[in-house]
Amino acid sequence: ARRWIARLAKGDLAPHAAAADLYAGEHWSVARRFPELSLPGETVRLWACSAGYGLIPASAPVMPYHATLTPGQADSVPGNSAAWWSELSQWPGPEPSLARSIQALVAEDPGAVFLLVLSRNYLNACGPDVAAARARISDARQLMIVSAGTRPQGALADLMIPADARLQARFGGTRRALNARIGGHLLSAGIRNAAEATEHMRQLLAEQPPVPRYDRVRQSDPEILERIAKRLDHEPGASANRLLREFRDAGLACEQHRFSRLFRTLAEARP
């Protein structure tokens, strides 16, 4: 993490953009609208849990980078993701005057409401920080975590708002953006505490149909490598995530970690 931070710190002359403008994908296209969902007299501020920069406001100037807290990807951060997150929080970052951890952000305004919209892997990385933040907040009900499909456990269990893949039938979009859509729904519905959010989401879950099951065909490593090679011949810049989505859309089965490993092996071997 220290070498990574040093690289970013030396990039002061590189082109910068606001984090919210740099981040692409459906999740961020939904999350960008969160500040528009405030109640009268309320201000909604959007922050990002960035694998490259740590906790930053969505307006922070950042350089393009390749890093993720999701394991098994070509650009996954090395080692323990929680340790990586902790190291980033010690760095002043692109906005040195602002909070660099969730704990520090909560400590600055313990009476505010905090809605954390995080995938399972990002919650694993930020978990110790969130647990420390809980001790700082005036009322634990003002701290809510939306992480669809993540099993509630440990010190954060009662902060988790019930949510799983069934809600995709209600909110639409892709599974990757489901957390953001749930977060936006809670904001637009005026729900600002965990007890109300829990009751509301349990009712929504009870109204949803079961998650569809897909009978995909498993492939051997050589078969998967052949498919990846053909796609990269046609489009060298295609990402592992994109090719995996295409692979699954074609009715084929492969775990994300396995596919990413094969993609990385092939990409490194290509001239």
List each model region and its residues:
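Active-site helix-to-loop segments that bind/position phosphate- or nucleotide-bearing substrates
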Residues: 1-32
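Long, charge-dense
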Residues: 52-104
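Short acidic, S/G/P-rich loop/turn micro-motifs used as interaction or catalytic elements
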Residues: 120-126
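Glycine-rich, aromatic-bearing surface loops/beta-hairpins
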Residues: 142-203
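Basic, amphipathic alpha-helix used for nucleic-acid engagement in HTH/winged-helix/SANT-Myb modules
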Residues: 186-229, 271
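Positively charged, polyanion-binding regions of nucleic-acid-associated proteins
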Residues: 217-240, 250, 262-271
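Append "Primarily bacterial transcriptional regulators
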Residues: 243
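Short helix-coil junctions and helix-kink-helix linkers
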Residues: 246-253
